[in-house]
Amino acid sequence: MLSAVRRAIPLSARILRTSLIQRCAGATSAAVTGAAPPQFDPIAAEKGFKPLHSHGTLFKIERYFAAAMVPLIPAAYFIHGREMDLCLALALTLHVHWGVWGVVNDYGRPFVLGDTLAAAVRVGAYIFTACLLAGLLYFNEHDVGLTRAFEMVWEL
């Protein structure tokens, strides 16, 4: 029960409360002993809570995915077909979505834009991704396809 209560209190409030208590206690002991008050230890503070999710895992997946796209793009020049077109469309859409989502997370925060506009920008990123995927799939189905289009560009 205590751990559930501690998780309900934001980390910043717990750190602030702890540091205020330490400062008050340290001020009286420092006045008596002449020693400096204890310093905040961020490593010990991190051990006190468990994060809800890890951004590092998603970052690693994005980097591995980008590295896997390096041979995929030249392979699309040599291998034609619906499967390669679909694979390329999905890979490009996912890669662009992660890039746009990174920009939205950096610059489209509620602190910067306000709650309403920040929510609209986040929804807009998903709409942009859905339109991109729909457009690429439509191009693959009703036109020459991405692999053939790349070949036609290189023939220019």
UniProtKB/Swiss-Prot annotation:
Primary site of residence: mitochondrion
How the cofactor is bound: the record states: The heme b is bound between the two transmembrane subunits CybS and CybL.
Q: List the disulfide bonds.
A: none
Residues exposed to the Mitochondrial intermembrane side: 79-83, 142-156
What InterPro entries does the database record attribute to this sequence?
Answer: CybS, SQR/QFR_C/D
Q: Where is the transit peptide?
A: 1-25
Segments in the Mitochondrial matrix topological domain: 26-59, 105-119
Task: Quote the record's binding site residues for heme b.
Answer: H95
Cellular component per GO? mitochondrial inner membrane; mitochondrial membrane; respiratory chain complex II (succinate dehydrogenase)
Q: Which prosthetic group or cofactor does it need?
A: heme b
Keyword annotations for this protein?
A: Electron transport, Heme, Iron, Membrane, Metal-binding, Mitochondrion, Mitochondrion inner membrane, Transit peptide, Transmembrane, Transmembrane helix, Transport
- GO MF annotations for this entry? heme binding; metal ion binding; ubiquinone binding
Tissue specificity is: Expressed in adult muscles (at protein level).
- Which residue ranges run through the membrane? 60-78, 84-104, 120-141
So where does a rhodoquinol get bound? Y107
Keyword Nucleus listed = no
Where in the cell is the protein located? Mitochondrion inner membrane
Q: Name one GO biological process term.
A: mitochondrial electron transport, succinate to ubiquinone
Q: Does the keyword Methyltransferase apply?
A: no
Q: Give the protein's function.
A: Membrane-bound small subunit (CybS) of the mitochondrial electron transport chain complex II, which together with the membrane-bound large subunit (CybL), anchor the catalytic subunits to the inner mitochondria membrane. During the parasitic larvae and adult stages, which occur in an anaerobic environment, complex II acts as a fumarate reductase by transferring electrons from rhodoquinol to fumarate.
Q: How does it assemble?
A: Component of the mitochondrial electron transport chain complex II composed of four subunits: a flavoprotein (Fp), an iron-sulfur protein (Ip), and a large cytochrome b (CybL) subunit and a small cytochrome b (CybS) subunit. There are 2 developmental stage-specific forms of complex II which have the Ip and CybL subunits in common. Complex II from the free-living larvae (aerobic environment) acts as a succinate dehydrogenase and is composed of the common subunit Ip and CybL and the stage specific subunits FpL and CybSL.
Family recorded in the similarity comment: Belongs to the CybS family.
Protein name stated in the entry: Succinate dehydrogenase [ubiquinone] cytochrome b small subunit 1, mitochondrial
Query: What is the scientific name of the source organism?
Result: Ascaris suum (Pig roundworm)
Its ancestry begins with:
Eukaryota, Metazoa, Ecdysozoa, Nematoda, Chromadorea
* Gene name as annotated: SDHD1
